[in-house]
Design a protein with these regions (language model features):
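Cleavable N-terminal export/targeting peptides
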Residues: 1-41, 408-409
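Subset of outer-membrane beta-barrel
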Residues: 27-409
């Protein structure tokens, strides 16, 4: 039987590992379960982790703004990591890994009733494996057992979209969080996320004749998004009176998309998108060490942080761009800084079969198989990388990758 002292040593080792993660994640604040702040989207991570306002069907973005469910174009999608991410590889801990997967479904009510509404639902899972730890007793350093530390969350999300020319969406997530530090030293909590998203298709609204030239239409969209994540609840391992707060966070962002669309097959010949996002942890500490939640906007300033793009010690700024070529190749770059982070640059690449299927359909109008693929199926591969200007940063060479299947009925 493990003694109280043995458990304390185990917990101390585990919290040391968690502290290293906190250094990278919690924006200078002290909160529990900071793994909730890790961006799970390889697509977004290639663009500086900006995701709250981006126009995308990427299922992983639901983890940080459930309103995306109201604006997705596909009826069903699933995304997963083909290989686990080695989290903070600079630490040299091979069994410190991060993994995630998401299932999304959506229906357009306009197909059944004369209301321009759509409803989406999603389930997602995130796992952080903290590695294998030795269990010792109070009598000495002899190992009397081993255990695997891990944290995970399961989330159900619901989103509603309203298309009245301007596209509006809102969403909510219910999340169950479990932190397993050792047998008998486990903790769990519930939290909620709330999100809003607005997309303004400017070119469509102001141009009566969509063609820029024969058969080609311009694309110019602006979007705004915001989300409150990890709302409510605290988590404790021993004493509920000493519970730690969850990493409540406010995100606000804007995005633009420019491009050209081939009308005949509804294919984007080329697109350029850019996003900027500000994040602020809404947890403060009193002088006696107790915690409190700050106001809904915390230290955020729309003018300073979003328009000017200035980061501060309390506010993290993420920004990035993407170039899409024929809905086939996507090239991404970005960065984030502030809120406890030093400068981190990101890059990524995406490959989609959508453009390939649409291109093949141009010369296969009588080929039912090719047309079915073009109209109803899409496969994505996305990967991204983190690097810093510091040779000893734990984040250097962090790599994410995902595979996604999209089906449109």
């Amino acid at each position: 039987m493990t003694t109280k002292t043995g458990v304390s040593l185990i917990l101390a080792s585990m919290l040391t590992a968690l502290h290293l993660i906190c250094i990278e994640l919690s924006f200078g604040q002290t909160t529990a379960v900071p793994f909730l702040l890790i961006s799970s989207s390889p697509e977004s991570n290639g663009q500086g982790t900006a995701s709250v306002s981006r126009q995308t069907d990427d299922p992983f973005v639901v983890n940080f703004n459930p309103a995306h469910l109201g604006g997705m174009q596909n009826n069903f999608s699933v995304s997963f990591y083909p290989t686990k991410t080695n989290w903070l590889p600079g630490l040299g801990l091979k069994d410190l890994t991060y993994n995630s997967y998401v299932f999304c479904g959506k229906t357009n009510l306009k197909e059944y009733v004369s209301v321009p509404l759509s409803i989406g639902i999603a389930y997602s899972r995130v796992d952080l494996n903290l590695g294998t730890f030795n269990r010792t007793s109070a009598a000495g350093p002899d190992v009397i057992g081993i255990f695997n530390g891990e944290e995970h969350n399961d989330a159900m999300s619901l989103g509603v979209g309203w298309d009245i020319g301007i596209k509006l969406a809102m969403g909510i997530t219910f999340r169950r969080i479990v932190s397993n530090l050792e047998g008998g030293v486990n903790a769990s909590a519930w939290s909620r996320d709330y999100g809003l998203l607005m997309n303004v298709p400017i070119a469509e609204l102001i141009t009566k004749k969509p063609e820029l030239i024969a058969g080609i239409a311009p694309l110019f969209d602006f979007s705004f998004g915001t989300a409150l994540t990890n709302m409510d609840g605290t988590i404790s391992y021993f004493d509920k009176a000493q519970a730690d707060p969850l990493p409540r966070n406010i995100s606000i962002g804007t995005s633009i998309v420019l491009g050209l669309n081939l009308i005949k097959i509804d294919s984007k010949i080329i697109t350029f998108s850019w996003s900027r996002q500000a994040d602020n942890i809404l947890v403060g500490r009193n002088q006696d060490g107790s915690s409190y939640y700050r106001g809904i906007f915390g230290d955020l300033s729309f003018g300073k942080n979003i328009i000017q793009g200035k980061w501060t010690d309390a506010v993290k700024i993420s920004q990035g761009w993407q170039i899409g070529l024929g809905e086939f190749i996507y090239i991404r770059q970005g960065s984030y800084q502030g809120g406890g982070f030093n400068y981190i640059k990101t890059d990524g690449l995406g490959i989609s079969t959508s453009g390939l299927f649409k291109f093949l359909s141009l010369g296969a109008e009588g080929n039912t198989f090719i047309n079915q693929l073009s109209d109803h199926f899409d496969l994505h591969y996305d990967q991204s990388n983190y690097d810093t200007n510091e040779l000893d940063s734990p984040s250097n060479s962090t790599k994410f990758s995902s595979l996604s299947l999209f089906i449109k009925f």
